[in-house]
From Swiss-Prot:
It is an enzyme of class 6 (ligase). Its EC number is 6.1.1.6. Homodimer. GO terms for cellular component: cytosol. It comes from Shewanella baltica (strain OS155 / ATCC BAA-1091). The keyword Protein biosynthesis applies. The lineage of its organism: Bacteria, Pseudomonadati, Pseudomonadota, Gammaproteobacteria, Alteromonadales. This is Lysine--tRNA ligase. It catalyses: tRNA(Lys) + L-lysine + ATP = L-lysyl-tRNA(Lys) + AMP + diphosphate.
Length: 500
């Protein structure tokens, strides 16, 4: 057992002893629930922070505050609530009357304080403590070096501690909530209806990914946590709801990385009588307005860069992007879509770039992998990438001028994909054939290929109007708005391996 663990156990024992010592003096409960707060710290700062010391004394304003003790220096306490921090001061008369109880307070305890509001000589507001009540005794101490809480793994495993001590973490999740609310409000103003679709699917679909599998005991059948809500949302468009959206979780049984978590949040929406170009315009409008609303500017820092959400956003085909970011590669500069259709040509090109390839990859998959290897990470400013091949876009409508590609885009910022959208495939026969091609790919070893969904084909046979749909990764978008570079910093409880 380490010295640090021994010291922590000693502190826990001391705090338990303090709790036991006050129990006999508690007529009802050592964890009372009758104290009522009148103000939060930030409210007091906003309403009275500009007053002079003399004005506050003349006002004689009494308040009740509540929160966690974050510092204790002699007769001063620093109390933190959800809005911020404020000091409380115990006068000598109070200390004499409540000295033993006051000395028993520890950093981390949650207390309620009532008293008159004053201004210190340094210009800080404080509550002159007339009475206080211990509301919750903290049995575990905060980390000794809690300012900053440098241990990343502890921050993720004990997010509650991280939120107590790390203002940046609190602000990140406050911003996350604001981003989600702003997106929801934007969609409602655009006359989209918010809906909820199943989280457990009989057939996983809507994206190319490996699903989580569970078992429904009552029905005695396997079920899958959803990898995307797409096929259910489009069924609703078939049913006559012309504009729908959903903000919810998706689950993909894949690896962990700074940009991937198996459980993540998406906003997915569908819009009848629109195409993928309409979605790009809508995305520009949404993100620029949200940035200005939440940050006061369309420009925001991201690492060493400044991302400009003001628009218009760049629009490049995947082939154009590969050529733009490989200016010295003569083969790539001369490449055409006819060559992209040649799987052997694409294999040789990928190998020449030092890439490891899978034998079942199609020409479209090879093009996408080359794009990811050489171009994607360089797309710092908002950029729409179009021209995705049909073989990697099984639910997207083919382009009228070039049937090899689809009317699809992915949206990139900060070197990563944030959104994916396309004009929907509403040809039931074409969709049937593409599902069958996905089954063949799965049989060939691609465990991320889609399943065949016969009921969805039936829905299409009833008629899906011309429709466009898009998914936006909320977690990755919040990473941009909070200038963070790992997805775990914007997910409250990210996936972690069990501790040994």
């Amino acid at each position: 057992m380490t010295e640090q663990v021994i010291d922590e156990n000693k502190l826990i024992a001391e705090r338990r002893a303090k709790l036991e010592s006050i129990r006999p003096n508690c007529s009802a409960n050592a964890h009372p629930n009758t104290f009522r707060r009148t103000h939060k710290a930030a409210e007091l700062q906003a309403q009275y922070g500009q007053n002079t010391k003399e004005e506050l004394e003349a006002l004689g304003f009494k308040t009740s505050i509540a929160g966690r003790i974050m510092a204790k220096r002699g007769p001063f306490l620093v109390i933190q609530d959800v809005s911020g921090r404020i000091q409380a001061y115990a006068e000598k008369s109070v200390q004499a009357d409540l000295k033993e109880r006051f000395q028993g307070l520890d950093i981390g305890d949650i207390i309620g304080v009532t008293g008159q509001l004053h201004l210190s000589g340094k210009g800080d507001l404080y509550v002159n403590m007339e009475q206080y009540e211990l509301l919750t005794k903290a049995l575990r101490p905060l980390p000794a070096d809690y300012y900053g809480l440098a241990d990343q793994e502890m921050r993720y495993r004990q997010r509650y501690v991280d939120l107590i001590v790390n203002e940046d973490s609190r602000n990140a999740f406050i911003m996350r909530s604001k981003v989600v609310s702003a997106i929801r409000n934007f969609m409602i103003k655009k006359e989209f209806m918010e809906v909820e679709t199943p989280m457990m699917h009989v057939i996983p679909g809507g994206a190319s990914a490996r699903p989580f599998i569970t078992h429904h005991n009552a029905l005695d059948m396997p079920m899958y946590l959803r990898i995307a809500p797409e096929l259910y949302l489009k069924r609703l468009v078939v049913g006559g709801f012309e504009r729908v959206f959903e903000i919810n979780r998706n689950f993909r049984n894949e690896g962990l990385s700074p940009r991937h978590n198996p459980e993540f949040t998406m906003m997915e929406f569908y819009m009848a009588y629109a195409d993928y170009k309409d979605l790009m315009d809508l995305t520009e409008e949404m993100l620029s307005s949200i940035a200005i609303e939440l940050l006061g500017s369309a420009q925001m820092p991201y690492g060493e860069h400044t991302v400009d959400f003001g628009g218009p956003y760049a629009r490049l085909s995947m082939l154009e992007a590969i050529q733009k970011y490989n200016p010295d590669n003569a083969t790539i500069q001369a490449m055409t879509y006819e060559q992209v259709k040649d799987v052997e040509f694409m294999r040789d090109l990928a190998k020449s770039l030092g890439m490891k390839i899978e034998k079942f990859w199609t020409c479209g998959q090879l093009l996408e992998e080359i794009f990811g290897e050489t171009a994607e990470w360089q797309l710092m400013q908002p950029t729409f990438i179009t021209g995705y091949p049909a073989d990697i876009s099984p639910l997207a409508r083919r382009n009228d001028d070039n049937h090899f590609i689809t009317d699809r885009f992915e949206f990139f910022i900060g070197g990563r994909e944030v959104a994916n959208g396309f004009s929907e495939l509403n040809d039931a026969e074409d969709q049937d054939n593409r599902f069958k091609a996905q089954v063949d790919a799965k049989d060939a070893g691609d465990d991320e290929a889609m399943f065949y969904d016969a009921d969805y084909i039936t829905a299409l046979e009833h008629g899906l109007p011309p429709t466009a749909g898009q998914g936006i990764g909320i977690d990755r978008l919040v990473m941009l708005f909070t200038n963070t570079h790992t997805i775990r910093d914007v997910i409250l409880f990210p996936a972690m391996r069990p501790q040994a």
